[in-house]
UniProtKB/Swiss-Prot annotation:
It is an enzyme of class 2 (transferase). PANTHER family: ELECTRON TRANSFER FLAVOPROTEIN BETA SUBUNIT LYSINE METHYLTRANSFERASE (PTHR43648:SF1). It catalyses: L-lysyl-[protein] + 3 S-adenosyl-L-methionine = N(6),N(6),N(6)-trimethyl-L-lysyl-[protein] + 3 S-adenosyl-L-homocysteine + 3 H(+). Keywords: Cytoplasm, Methyltransferase, S-adenosyl-L-methionine, Transferase. CDD domains: AdoMet_MTases. It is found in: Cytoplasm. S-adenosyl-L-methionine binds at T153, G174, D196, N263. Pfam families: PrmA. This is Ribosomal protein L11 methyltransferase. Its main location: cytoplasm. It comes from the Bacteria. GO terms for biological process: methylation. It comes from Chloroflexus aurantiacus (strain ATCC 29366 / DSM 635 / J-10-fl). Its EC number is 2.1.1.-.
Length: 328
């Protein structure tokens, strides 16, 4: 039996460059996987951590050492060279890993993480003794986006803790690892629909839903709303040859959801604003995140144009999360 070797590509970046460099590595890395190695400050009690936003972040991706590996490595280096012209990056580091080393290399970077008052994210390979009232999310990210480590995910989890009400119909759009959908279910939602245009993310989300035993509450499917159907995997930045027509909303459910969590990026939120408004029930709430501060005004304007009312704004570093309500 032939054993596959892997090429690890790693680069140290400032926190503000994490999103840009992650998109590049996801575009070329195996299964779109990117490991985010952040600095953590240990809590006073138990395995609880806080992210240190003042220190650089290591990003890693992996390539199978096949005939295309060298060409792909050069493409990554070329793309990162362009980023380096506008943001500081550390030198690119590479190393070769055997199959068994690669399979576990990324797991060391995920600690048990408390987010908000009740939510605790526990990697599936670690043990954790829950405290009273803890909402435990067992997560194997499989190198898919949505581990709870990124500020945008943490902002959403904080809001879900407070906004999810018993029996609600919830949509998690761009579910990634399924973390927000699982959290909504465990916080009391009646039914949750988790959508993603990336088939790898859909598979990982399915596995995590079953791992958390919420498959009776959470439906995972490949897809998006209306105009998002034509986009492909939005996290890669590849929207296809043309921008989808924002007037195409035939696939958007009408007034279906009490709560929508859309942890995407600003330009996708702007494009999907009409679909998001249509999918909300009157009085329903939209949590939008993945918004870098310089793009916030565009999102606010797009949501206002479709009649959504902003009721909350939350910030972590350069990232913004908003809460909007559809009028009654």
């Amino acid at each position: 039996m032939q054993t596959t070797s892997w090429l690890e590509i790693a680069v140290e970046v400032d926190p503000e460059a994490v999103e840009t460099v992650s998109e590049i590595l996801a575009r070329y890395g195996y299964n779109g996987g990117v490991v985010v190695e952040q600095s953590w400050i240990a809590g006073d009690e138990g395995p609880e951590f806080q992210y240190d936003p003042n220190r650089p972040v290591w990003l890693r991706t992996y390539l199978p050492l096949d005939a295309q590996a060298e060409e792909t490595r050069q493409q990554i280096e070329h793309a990162l060279w362009h980023v380096h012209q506008i943001r500081p990056l550390g030198p690119i580091q590479t190393r070769t890993l055997a199959e068994e080393d690669w399979a576990n290399a990324w797991k060391q970077f995920y600690p048990v993480l408390r987010v908000g008052e009740r939510t605790v994210i526990v990697p599936s390979w670690l043990e954790y003794q829950p405290q009273p009232n803890d909402v435990v999310l067992l997560l194997d990210p499989g190198m898919a986006f949505g581990t709870g480590l990124h500020p945008t995910t943490r902002l959403c989890l904080h809001l879900l803790e407070r906004l999810v009400q018993p029996g609600q119909q919830v949509l998690d759009l761009g579910t990634g690892s399924g973390i927000l959908a699982i959290a909504a279910a465990k916080l009391g939602a009646g039914q949750v629909l988790a959508l993603d245009n990336d088939p790898i993310a859909v598979r990982v989300a399915h596995e995590n839903v079953e791992r958390n035993q919420v498959q009776d509450l959470v439906t995972v499917a490949e897809g998006s709303l209306g105009a998002g159907q034509a986009m492909g995997h939005w996290l890669s930045g590849d929207f296809g040859p043309e921008t989808p027509d924002p007037t195409l909303h035939d696939n958007t459910p009408q007034a279906t959801f009490d709560l929508i969590a859309a942890n995407l990026i600003a330009k996708v939120l702007v494009l999907l604003a009409p679909d998001l408004a249509t999918a909300l029930k009157p009085g329903g709430l939209l949590i939008s995140s993945g918004i870098i501060d310089v793009k916030e005004a565009e999102v606010v304007a797009a949501f206002a144009a479709v009649g959504l009312q902003q009721i909350e704004r939350h910030v972590e570093g350069e990232w913004v999360a908003l809460v909007h309500r559809r009028p009654q």
